[in-house]
């Protein structure tokens, strides 16, 4: 348990250091490139030009975390208990329920015109969000599941203790997700908690970070903002079918895709 807390503290130290360094460099860049008396349109254009810079900083943070946790074997990418011959089947079936639920969630939010996106996500295009998807998927899986939950499992902690610990550790990220009015984004927090519960359960069964990387990345490919009601209805129907079918397939197929415990 102590190791899991130490991993979290180490991750926070590296993550915050990257943020402070990135914030300093971005602030310096804008200070040097914004002339005095600039119009708001010029400032907005300059803010858009720093997105690639922020993405580079994000990937730099990934490299730092990967080197630290990989070099000292705190975490690693592996298939875990998944049989290698069944890896593609496992990736598909494990992804179906959370992908379907995400489709249902986004379709309901858009069909009922509910404001659930933080301002930062509203300003980013679908393709522009992909790098952040990669960064977020890596951090979530490599640190919170591959290092922290893995250590909790090795310590013999019960599943509810694992989930409670992960929820507390991820809480600061949920607090940072605010609506345009400045309130805590309850909708995305609920989606994040449900995703956390599902991914924690999948990891406890498979012990596979590779499966979870695919799961996180694919579920984040669902378009989160659209105006077409037809698309919303189609996503709602397809998402419901994927969720129900995915859980049914998991209950039947998951045990046969895992290595049998020796005991």
Model features per residue range: what roles?
Residues 1-9, 71-87, 254-263:
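N-terminal juxtamembrane cytosolic/stromal segments of multi-pass membrane proteins
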Residues 3-21, 57-60, 92-102, 163-168:
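Alpha-helical transmembrane segments
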Residues 4, 8, 126-262:
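Transmembrane helix-loop-helix hairpins at the membrane interface
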Residues 9-71, 127-128, 233-241:
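Alpha-helical transmembrane segments in multi-pass membrane proteins
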Residues 16-35, 67-71, 102-111, 174, ...:
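Short hydrophobic alpha-helical membrane-anchoring segments
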Residues 30-50, 71-143, 149-150, 154-155:
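Juxtamembrane helix-loop-helix connectors linking adjacent transmembrane helices
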